[in-house]
Amino acid sequence: MIAKLMYPVVDCPDPAALAGFYARILDWEVDASDPEWVWLTSAAGQRIAFQEAKDHRPPRWPDPEFPQQFHLDFEVDTIEDVERAQREVMALGAEFLHDSGGERKGFRVFNDPAGHPFCLCYGQSL
């Protein structure tokens, strides 16, 4: 091993707002003591950082002219759970992009408020 992963860092125009969006999904704590670098931390100590990027150009998945830089996958158990989760993330400001279909296993793609794609996956452990 050359190194250990510390945490992902997400570029965005408003770190506090985007960290707040993901905090509501994950139920993690936000540390916005530095407005240009905001932390999201789980009870177990996992972290995601959100860094201000004034010139942030959001991706437009699946448009190759504006490709995604990364995406996060979140897991729920069943299609019923993904239905509930979809309503909740959209109420937080997510934009629905794609449904892979599948009654027992699949994923749905959304944009977060800064334009980064993320997925709600279900049935992955079947």
Predicted features along the sequence, with ranges:
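Glyoxalase I/VOC metalloenzyme domain signal
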Residues: 1-6, 10-32, 42-95, 111-126
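Short hydrophobic/aromatic beta-strand element in the GNAT-like acyltransferase core
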Residues: 37, 107-109
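Short, small/polar residue-rich loop motifs at catalytic or cofactor-binding pockets
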Residues: 103-105
